[in-house]
Amino acid sequence: ILETDDLVEQRKFIERLHNMARDAGRAREFDGVLRAFITDFIQEKKQQASDQKTRFFDQPMELFCGQWRAEDTGISMVYYDSKNMPQTICACPHPILPVEILKNVDTNEERICLAYLKYGEWQRITVDRDVCADAKKIVGPLSKNGVEVTSENAKYLVRYLSDCIGLNPAALKPKPSINRLGWMGQQFMPYAQDIRYEGDPNFESSFRAVCEKGDYQIWKEHCHILRENKVVRMAFAASASSVILE
């Protein structure tokens, strides 16, 4: 009875059985058995859905998503209301999932990188952790970047993202990140290994521009000549001091 997707036919069939039970003088017994059956049915469905995984086309990674159905048509969940009738809620009409958690080495604050499929290609956006935990905060940053989130489905999207993060601690283990140049322990940014930049996007190009280029030996020989001038030598010392000092 409950496996059918046609709610009208489902209701008609239950009413027919109820009338037959009433004619037999066992309506109350039928109602009790039906309630118990529906409760068991719902629990079984929840158990079956608890191990679901994301199934997006060309997804960057596969995650456990609990009771959410995460497919190319969007993210949704079926729940049963107070009358034990199935209801569907939609968290997002297109694929989206957390793919990376960045933990700032200076502040210990976390940011979450979300991947979402729009216009036939996967795109990414990184937001503060509290944005993904608040239905009011999540709408602005995500919607202006193309994610279909509104005040109506925001709370469901927050629940979905929270479930994905909570169910995948190994796949989404926080990675160290930094938003500045300079020393980080015994390593110096931007040359440190396995540390991500997660600062203001407007300064990322400047951050990436600091890199090794040219011939060190030629530079060294030329600077050796320039350092014969005391003023130039002082300028060299001043420019290097911020790097030398932690």
Predicted regions and their residues:
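Positively charged, polyanion-binding regions of nucleic-acid-associated proteins
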Residues: 1-3
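Conserved glycine-centered beta->alpha loop in an early N-terminal alpha/beta scaffold
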Residues: 6-227
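Contiguous, well-ordered alpha-helical segments that form the cores/surfaces of helical PPI scaffolds
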Residues: 231-245
